[in-house]
Amino acid sequence: PETTVETINNGEALKVTFDSGILFATNSSTLSDASRSALRKLAVSLNENPDTDIKIVGYTDNTGKVDCNQTLSEKRAKSVYDYLMVDQGVSGRRMEYEGKGVHDPVASNDTPEGRALNRRVEILILANEKMIQDAQQGTLK
């Protein structure tokens, strides 16, 4: 799958996972046209739900040097962050990004299919304090 959405933390957050193959060319942190389209759709939802915080996390497979993969994962996460903020108007105050490189794989790096699954960007969408307070007070819109 190119993009998956799932609930995590007992339903307290959403995790949107983008296959890095649709976001970036190999060894690149420049967003592809297809990725801009997918991220544009996500940005509409993010802008319609301003009481959420966003964490963008980049990952790689284990091919190549660990430090190069770490840097690449950080640059890819920052590319998504910059696009959402600069091009789509999502507030930078509600977003953070990080790269995890080869850490936290979701599949075995022993097969091409597993490595493809590990090359990804995850966007975590979490309720912020205002949304939590509104939910507790019964005023959530």
Predicted segment positions?
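A short, charged
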Residues: 41-71
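Periplasmic peptidoglycan-binding/tethering modules of Gram-negative envelope proteins
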Residues: 1-53, 126-141
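Periplasmic OmpA-like peptidoglycan-binding domain that tethers envelope proteins to the cell wall
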Residues: 59-141
